[in-house]
């Protein structure tokens, strides 16, 4: 039995929370994962996992062995990176993720500058408006908007964004400018499918929040489509401010209901751990964080 491989498999199961998720993460057949865990338990003469149909839970022995395995594998990885020179020169593939518009408009310019600066690093960018899992999707650094759900990740804040309401000048001239959220019932709106925002929009009212009904004249599935429709004069739409910053500066979209803006949402770079980071990852975070912060601060200007 390859004990380092067995430790790697057990850690994948523990981190992913199930054998099937570990199988997807490692790209190894489900039966192989189960067999290697069973072999390790036989070798140790101890039960490491409590299995159920969907999830697994570490036993007391499993918790202790996983903690020790994590330290051992980290030390082995450090030794390999030191021997290969990775701690002297950042190199290798770096996998990044971000929401589509935020990634295209703000992360991509940083990445192109980073690639010019570090020719030994290759980057793979995964842009998606659904939340990707850093562990399961093999992501080194993610750019995230909103409250962080996984407390085991390390986060570096690079700014805040807000949800705003906007429309094209032609629409506002034709239909008038809403003064309060109650006015929305008299307007056409562009909303997103499969979300509550297609029926109501939430605004702060005093110290609480209140839902206001909206009329969805057009329902779309992407932010880009909503922006184009708003510019074309179809109606009001509600977006995160970074999604319309270019159009707002160009004058093709105007903000309304600015006195009723929602609370700011934090934007973070997230990654696994802060100690023993591969040099390529630490180098990117140090390079990207101040540049992203400056770019995001410029959204409202």
Q: Where does each model-flagged region fall?
A:
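Flexible hinge/capping segments at coil-to-helix
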Residues: 152-163, 167-190
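Short helix-loop hinge/linker segments at domain boundaries
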Residues: 53-56, 63, 74-97
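Short helix-boundary/capping micro-motifs
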Residues: 12-27
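A short LG(V/I)-centered, amphipathic sequence patch enriched
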Residues: 41-58
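Central regulatory/effector-binding core of bacterial HTH transcription factors
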Residues: 92-154, 301
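Secondary-structure junction motif
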Residues: 188-207
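C-terminal effector-binding regulatory domain of bacterial HTH transcription factors
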Residues: 67, 120, 242-250, 254, ...
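Conserved amphipathic alpha-helical core elements
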Residues: 40-41, 253
